[in-house]
UniProtKB/Swiss-Prot annotation:
<dbReference type="InterPro" id="IPR053940">
    <property type="entry name" value="UTP25_NTPase-like"/>
</dbReference>
<keyword id="KW-0690">Ribosome biogenesis</keyword>
<dbReference type="Pfam" id="PF22916">
    <property type="entry name" value="UTP25_NTPase-like"/>
</dbReference>
<feature type="region of interest" description="Disordered">
    <location>
        <begin position="1"/>
        <end position="175"/>
    </location>
</feature>
<dbReference type="GO" id="GO:0019843">
    <property type="term" value="F:rRNA binding"/>
</dbReference>
<dbReference type="GO" id="GO:0005730">
    <property type="term" value="C:nucleolus"/>
</dbReference>
<feature type="compositionally biased region" description="Basic residues">
    <location>
        <begin position="27"/>
        <end position="37"/>
    </location>
</feature>
<comment type="subunit">
    <text>Component of the ribosomal small subunit (SSU) processome composed of at least 40 protein subunits and snoRNA U3.</text>
</comment>
<keyword id="KW-0698">rRNA processing</keyword>
<feature type="compositionally biased region" description="Basic and acidic residues">
    <location>
        <begin position="47"/>
        <end position="59"/>
    </location>
</feature>
<dbReference type="InterPro" id="IPR053939">
    <property type="entry name" value="UTP25_C"/>
</dbReference>
<dbReference type="Pfam" id="PF06862">
    <property type="entry name" value="Utp25_C"/>
</dbReference>
<keyword id="KW-0539">Nucleus</keyword>
<dbReference type="GO" id="GO:0032040">
    <property type="term" value="C:small-subunit processome"/>
</dbReference>
<protein>
    <recommendedName>
        <fullName>U3 small nucleolar RNA-associated protein 25</fullName>
    </recommendedName>
</protein>
<feature type="compositionally biased region" description="Gly residues">
    <location>
        <begin position="1"/>
        <end position="26"/>
    </location>
</feature>
<dbReference type="InterPro" id="IPR027417">
    <property type="entry name" value="P-loop_NTPase"/>
</dbReference>
Length: 723
């Protein structure tokens, strides 16, 4: 079994895609690519790691498809479930063969609908899309590994949009308001404003303005169309009365939440005026307000985008789905869905019990010592493999509607990637993304710890003109859809706890909104001021000629400046060094160096990475505490998914700074505090050594503070001490 204990049982195609080890783990140079307890990250290819001096078995960097750590009890349950499913699959083979033969002989017109349903379920690994009917008897289609039933599978034909039932249409209860942002941006944009802005976008001409508001910095980019007098920021919004909402939403929200809190007032002007936004100050305390604003905006857009079928207007897209929400876990999906339900107050909820059975986990599984952000992200169902279509009618919400019949699609990046298929397949299905007009990415910082390539893949396939008609009435399609300009009208909203180069690049390359885009970033006082103990913190800057040269320059500095210090320690002073390494690729490089280089042959070490299972991690922690291992190599993603409370730490070496500033506080402060309390370290004698380059400016700002970062990046000196 691969590290993590689940690689042999979580593969297959029953969730709508290939084996998890095959697509999720490629990651990036940042070592990303999986979710907690479920996800897989493929390790870099190369020779198998051979550590002759390390007693415990280590993971192989050439091993692919390994799962993230899980406890022994859940591993045992997976094994038992797998064996039972295999027996059921074998006994059902005659029946499956019969159903397969019946489907293969079915008329071609019927197969088209079944093909889509099967493709949505099976994804790229499916070789027999006709096999979807097998699932009607409760068996898993194409699942030879005995995997559990796909709770997100939908077997439903595409609806003909020209024959919509009366109950599927929304009430026309609002008078036309030409100042409504929906009308200004989508329905009836002014040609004299729109055309020069589109031309500026095509020429990559943007005008940037920096606006300071309290402790928040707003970087606003608008297409440089020569309209210098245009106001970059819309008018402030303090409550529901300032919004142009559908009447039913206005009446529902006014009694419950008439006034907005500070977070809501910050994001509402950009959000409801259809401008792209990267909000980099998401907190646990402000998460409820963010979900409220995002849900209200999504509902308002869906209700307004559903045109009157009796009018001969160009008011539609190619396909029905208008809103896409990318979320990290099933529990995060539950929170967003529940917020939507509380706002629109439907009379009926179709398939609600199925939703609760598949998405809600009420068991408490974390101890009190876990931090709030960890419990907020991983409480409930932390499965990062899901997709859910939601359809709205006048009085009903339908869960698990087929994508082409849905108004809003909720999905994790992996779940949606599986539904689309892989590039190796002859038939990819992403037409349902052709008319997405609003993308909401919540908890983007958590998605960075999964496989960010899936997010990039999804954005590359947004607003691409569809290959099939899907019953579209082209006489009703908006002209800018036909002109292949939908991406310039789509609004993208990203909420993250902090900013990273990946998020900035996503905003730069995939956000081309003609209304402009903004990045909201909080000024930071620095987490070094909030450490629970007094420790000497030394920040050492090394020079790197380019971003591509940074990994080699970092490794060279580590081996020349840090390793000799570790090798000099003797006796009891040699124990207790924790080396924190954010990137898994850097971790492999350092691990191999410690295992094979003569310079550190007298330095015993252990490792804890995101691939280490629970017994392996426990063994490494124990050996580190009792001094058998002098050095412990520890990755950022291992800390993200597990938040281990490591004891015996006397000194911390940051091979690179973490993206999440809370990790610095927990590792550099929390671990040393435990050592002081257990009398392993005298008060104030803990040591923290940090390596950084000029390309770590975003991370460094969150650690040392906005006021210090410029000096540390540009000063002639390369060593900075904090006490």
């Amino acid at each position: 079994m691969a590290p993590g204990g689940r690689a042999g049982f979580r593969g297959g195609s029953s969730r709508g895609g290939p084996s998890r080890g095959g697509t999720r783990g490629r990651g990036s140079s940042r070592g990303r690519g999986r979710g907690r307890g479920r996800a897989v990250a493929q390790q870099p290819r190369g020779a198998r790691f051979d550590d002759k001096r390390l007693a415990s078995k280590d993971e192989s960097e050439s091993e692919a498809g390994s799962e993230s750590p899980s406890d022994d009890e859940s591993d045992a349950m997976e094994v038992d479930s797998n064996e039972e499913d295999e027996e059921e699959t074998q006994s059902a083979q005659p029946y499956l063969s019969l159903m397969r033969s019946l489907v293969e002989s079915a008329p071609k017109a019927k197969r088209r609908k079944l093909d889509h349903a099967s493709a949505e379920r099976q994804g790229p690994e499916s070789t027999k899309p006709e096999a979807a009917p097998e699932a009607t008897d409760g068996e898993e289609d194409g699942d030879e590994d005995g995997e559990e039933r796909d709770v997100d599978f939908v077997e439903e034909p595409e609806e003909d949009p020209t024959n919509a039932a009366p109950e599927d249409l929304f009430d026309e209860d609002d008078d036309l308001d030409v100042s409504d942002p929906f009308e200004v941006h989508f329905a009836d944009p002014k040609e004299e404003v729109l055309r020069p802005r589109l031309e500026a976008i095509q020429g990559n001409k943007w005008r940037m303005e920096r606006i300071a508001a309290n402790s928040t910095r707003v970087f606003f980019n608008t297409p440089d169309a020569g309209d210098a007098a245009a106001k970059p920021l819309p008018a402030p919004i303090s409550g529901i009365s300032d919004l142009k909402l559908k009447k039913r939403l206005q009446e529902a929200m006014a009694p419950k939440h008439a006034k907005f809190d500070q977070v809501e007032q910050t994001i509402a002007p950009l959000l409801f005026n259809y401008q792209d936004m990267l909000y980099c100050n998401r907190t646990v305390a402000g998460s409820q307000g963010i979900r409220r604003m995002a849900s209200l905006h999504a509902l308002n857009h869906v209700f307004k985008a559903d045109g009157n079928e009796d009018l001969e207007l160009r008011d539609q897209g190619f396909t029905r789905p208008k809103v896409l929400m990318l979320l990290p876990t099933r529990q995060s999906c539950v929170k967003m869905v529940d917020m939507i339900v509380s706002i629109c107050e439907p009379d009926q909820q179709e398939n609600r019990k199925r939703f609760e059975d598949g998405y809600i986990d009420k068991q408490s599984k974390f101890s009190d010592d876990k931090p709030d952000d960890f419990k907020d992200l991983f409480s409930g169902s932390d499965d990062d493999m899901f997709r859910l279509g939601m359809k709205f009618t006048r009085k009903t919400i339908k869960y698990f509607s087929q994508f082409y019949n849905s108004d809003i699609i909720f999905a994790s990046p992996l779940g949606l990637r599986m539904a689309i298929g892989s590039e190796e397949e002859k038939k990819l299905d992403f037409d349902f993304l052709s008319s997405i007009e609003l993308v909401i990415v919540d908890q983007a910082d958590a998605l960075l710890m999964q496989n960010w390539e899936h997010v990039e893949f999804i954005f590359e396939h947004l607003n691409v003109q569809p290959k099939d008609a899907h019953g579209c009435d082209f006489s009703r399609v908006r002209s800018w859809y036909l002109d292949d300009q939908a991406k310039h009208f789509r609004q993208t909203v990203i909420f993250s706890a902090f900013n990273t180069p990946e998020l900035v690049e996503l905003l730069r390359t995939h956000c081309h909104n003609w209304a402009g885009k903004a990045r909201l970033q909080q000024e930071s006082a620095g987490t070094i001021q909030h450490l629970p103990v007094k420790a000497r913190q030394t920040f050492s800057r090394f020079e790197a000629g380019s971003i591509a040269a940074d990994p080699d320059a970092r490794f060279a500095y580590f081996t020349k400046a840090i390793v000799p210090m570790l090798a000099r320690h003797r006796g009891r002073d040699a124990a207790g060094t924790l080396v924190f390494i954010p990137s898994y690729l850097d971790f492999v490089r350092v691990r191999n160096y410690f295992a094979n280089n003569p310079a550190v042959e007298n330095v015993s070490f252990g490792t804890i990475s995101e691939y280490a299972d629970v017994p392996e991690a426990s063994r490494a922690r124990s050996h580190f505490l009792n001094g058998r291992h002098k050095v412990l190599l520890y990755t950022e993603r291992a800390h993200h998914f597990r938040r281990y409370q490591i004891k015996g730490v006397k000194r911390v070496v940051m091979y690179a700074l973490p993206d999440n500033p809370l990790f610095y506080q927990e590792i550099a402060g929390g671990y040393l505090q435990k050592s002081e309390q257990s009398l392993l370290v005298e008060h104030g004698q803990g040591v923290v050594r940090v390596m950084f380059s000029k390309y770590d400016v975003m991370k460094l700002e969150r650690i040392v503070g906005t006021s210090r970062v410029g000096k540390m990046i540009h000063d002639q000196g390369d060593t900075f001490d904090f006490v």
